[in-house]
Amino acid sequence: MDKLSEFCSKFVENVMKMTVNQLNKVTKELAKKITIDSNFKSVTDNNSVIESSKEITENKVIEKLEFNIILESFISSQRIKLIKTLRDLISIGLKEAKDLIETLPKTIYEGVSKEFAEETKKTLEESGASVIITENII
């Protein structure tokens, strides 16, 4: 594979990993920086290609989810264990962790992957916390 083909392949892979919001921003930036002659005919001028593109985008929106992790409550007898877990988990100091659990419910992570959200929930629940994971469709 030549260098241009390899570059294009990697570019497409990276684009496919992007969220709809990210794609929208990239499109706007490209529109600002690239001027295309009005006589230029692209593949997207074909309605069937546009429709399949819409289907792919709609499917991608459903697949691309981000999650928020909300710490709701905790077992008071495990307060110290939870404070230690929070300090390690979200890299905050002792006072910040103590203040955080005194003002529940609190969102401790926003826009994280499903796997990360589930692992974090498990860790917090092992420390006596009650945790909710909410999803955001991007």
Curated annotation (Swiss-Prot):
Which keywords has UniProt assigned to this entry?
Answer: Plastid, Ribonucleoprotein, Ribosomal protein
UniProt-listed GO biological process terms: translation
InterPro entries the UniProt entry points to: Ribosomal_bL12 (IPR000206), Ribosomal_bL12_C (IPR013823), Ribosomal_bL12_C/ClpS-like (IPR014719)
One Pfam family cited in the UniProt record for this chain:
Ribosomal_L12
Report the main location listed first in the record: plastid
Annotated GO molecular function terms are: mRNA binding; structural constituent of ribosome
Where it sits in the cell: the answer is:
Plastid
A GO CC annotation given for this chain: ribonucleoprotein complex
State if Plastid is listed as a keyword.
yes
The parts of the chain that form a coiled coil are none
Q: Which HAMAP family match?
A: Ribosomal_bL12
Q: Briefly, what is this protein's role?
A: Forms part of the ribosomal stalk which helps the ribosome interact with GTP-bound translation factors. Is thus essential for accurate translation.
Question: Subunit structure, per the record?
Answer: Homodimer. Part of the ribosomal stalk of the 50S ribosomal subunit. Forms a multimeric L10(L12)X complex, where L10 forms an elongated spine to which 2 to 4 L12 dimers bind in a sequential fashion. Binds GTP-bound translation factors.
Stated family: Belongs to the bacterial ribosomal protein bL12 family.
Name of this chain's protein: Large ribosomal subunit protein bL12c
Provenance organism: Euglena longa (Euglenophycean alga)
